[in-house]
Design a protein with these regions (language model features):
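Metal-dependent amide/peptide-bond hydrolase catalytic core
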Residues: 34, 41, 48-246
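Acidic/histidine-rich catalytic neighborhood of metal-dependent amide-processing enzymes
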Residues: 1-44
Length: 246
């Protein structure tokens, strides 16, 4: 489905859920997210927002006549830097999630000889599933209370839920120690629908968006083999039947 990586309003799975949720009825959803063949439970929530900083334009040769909005970003950057000093790990249902709060984009400047009259910084907060989207938003609004905030995207996290019978069966079939999902995935949407979901697929997520991003060809075969092995087990059909879904 389209638009999985951008703002929630464009997400194709969300549109299906809104228009024909019956098409998504299932006992277990397996999201083929890159996990390098390891089951990853739940997912982080994500919040993207901008903060606006005002200044006053002036010629850079007479900078004292203006107010540099770029320089006035410093307190925000200091908050972000200070935040990195605390322990970002949060334990949820036995899985150790790591939160992140980072500046990802800056917009400022008019010309090379003009003091910037305004600046906008975009920040991405990746939060653990021990909190709701509303709680995450409140935390950010309190942390950056001194600046006008515009929320661009806010998506709920999902708790691991690996104690569900089919999920437990799949973890056992894969045979590796499950871990947390660093990032937001559509397990959150299935969670909202009351459907157990987990992440499992080829490709090492630690290479995502890096210059050397790649996927081992063998990882495709290993993932397929794990899925086939699990689906061939008799108890999978039995557990699915006990799920009570049509």
């Amino acid at each position: 489905y389209e638009a999985e990586e951008i703002a929630a309003e464009h997400n194709g799975l969300g549109k299906i859920a809104a228009a024909r949720s019956d098409l998504l009825h299932a006992d277990l959803a397996i999201l083929m997210e890159p996990t390098d063949g390891v089951v990853e439970g739940g997912c982080q929530g994500t919040m993207r927002f901008t903060l606006d900083v005002a200044g006053q334009a002036a010629h850079s040769a007479r900078s004292w006549k203006g107010r540099n909005a770029i320089h006035r970003l410093l307190p925000i950057l200091q908050i972000l830097s200070d935040w990195q000093q605390h322990d970002p790990h949060v334990l949820v249902e036995g899985l150790r999630f790591r939160e992140g709060l980072n500046a990802t984009m800056l917009q400022a400047g008019v010309a090379g000889n003009v003091i910037a009259p305004s600046a906008k910084i975009q920040i991405n907060y990746r939060f653990a599933p021990d909190k709701t989207a509303a709680q995450a938003r409140t935390a950010m609004e309190e942390l950056f209370a001194d600046w006008p905030m515009t929320v661009l995207d806010l998506s709920s996290p999902a708790r691991p839920g690996l104690d569900q019978p089919l999920a437990t069966s799949f973890v056992a079939a894969v045979g590796s120690q499950p871990g947390p999902k660093y990032g937001w995935t559509d397990v959150a949407r299935f969670s909202e629908l009351g459907i157990p979901a987990l992440n499992f697929g080829p490709g090492d997520p630690m290479y995502a968006h890096k210059d050397d991003e790649c996927c081992r060809l063998a990882s495709l075969d290993e993932t397929l083999a794990a899925l086939v092995t699990w689906l061939d087990q008799d108890d999978v059909i039995k557990l699915a039947g006990e799920g009570g879904r049509p």
